[in-house]
Amino acid sequence: MRLSLAGLVVLALALVRAAPIEPTELHSKAAQGLRLLDLAEDAEPVWKTEDEKLELMRAGVHFFDVTETYEIEQQIPKSALRAPAATFPAPSQQTTVTRIIATLSTANMQASLTTLSNFNNRYYRSSTGADASTWILTTVRSIISGKSGISASNFAHSWGQSSTIVKFAGRDTSAPVTILGAHMDSINLSSPTSGRAPGADDDGTGTVNLIETLRALVAAGFTPATPLEFHWYSGEEGGLLGSNAVAANYANNGVRVKAFMELDMTGYFRPGSTEVVALEADYIDTGLNNFLKQVVTTYTRLPVTMDTPCGYACSDHASWFKYGIPTSMPFEAVTGNDNPRIHSSSDTISQSGFSWAHSLEFAKIAVAFAVELTS
């Protein structure tokens, strides 16, 4: 979550203003296999090869890959890309939330994560990454089977792995939607396409937190007053590809979004460190973070603290933030106490510091976020 010296040099080079990219150039260079990367806020995007893109990832540089979304983003009015700070009421649905979180099961989450981490990897361009997205869609469709007012579908991309979206219509279908997100993909930075990448914590934990939250809400017969969605994104590790595609689509189609919360890594804290919920400090909405502080205090056993800034495009919440949506991201630990083995074959549940009891608290947060903001 920190930029290296090499990353700072890359960002400096990107801060050169240029005219908008013409469609002919965009399509021609994309057809050659080049990728258009947005490396910094208010900087012009730059073209990189896939190998150069991978080197940026290895250097710890975060970015949006906007190759597929650049044209759509140019059509969205700039006035729509920033919203005033939002305010959210204090938690008031304790009876409902407490009843539902009592049904959350770490055994269910562990079973789901076992399946997900058994894929060789969930890289967005690999066949097993595509298989993982199929498994997620099949799983959530099974959960909502026979339930009215709830649907599940794929959001297709130009690469092999689709994103998955579950929608609760809500009683007032015209109201703004509340969204919870996680990313389904994983990566081994040494060998992305074929390397072993169980991605147990990054982001298997967030993925199964949301699957279990969905199961608990459906089993409880919860019907939101306003629309509620669960998103599992493809291609986060490749430059927030899936979330940016979905967010751009929603912005371009005028879909109103009340709030977005990302769960990206919820299962680890460094042995000997204080167990906390760490709220990301940048590219978030202060009002939503204040609401989450109350949620954590009301519904979990953990103290809440602020993390240090994670930087530009560090996870899927950034995709929504740039379209003016109130966003937040509760994280597993303060940076430095988080999982050091991500993006490798060692991101498994067997490492010291991984805790299902810890991850369960984030599923509680997800239930509370969903119920409190849609009731």
Language-model region placement:
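Active-site-adjacent substrate-binding region
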Residues: 269-375
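A non-catalytic alpha/beta surface segment that caps or lines the substrate-entry region
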Residues: 111-169
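Acidic/histidine-rich catalytic neighborhood of metal-dependent amide-processing enzymes
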Residues: 160-163, 194-287, 291, 316
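N-terminal hydrophobic or amphipathic helices/low-complexity stretches enriched
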Residues: 69-126
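Primarily auto-inhibitory N-terminal propeptides
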Residues: 18-84
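Solvent-exposed loop/turn segments at secondary-structure junctions
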Residues: 121-124, 157-161, 170-174, 184-188, ...
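Second-shell loop/turn segments in exported
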Residues: 95-104, 118-128, 150-154, 192-203, ...
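Fungal secretory targeting signals
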Residues: 1-20
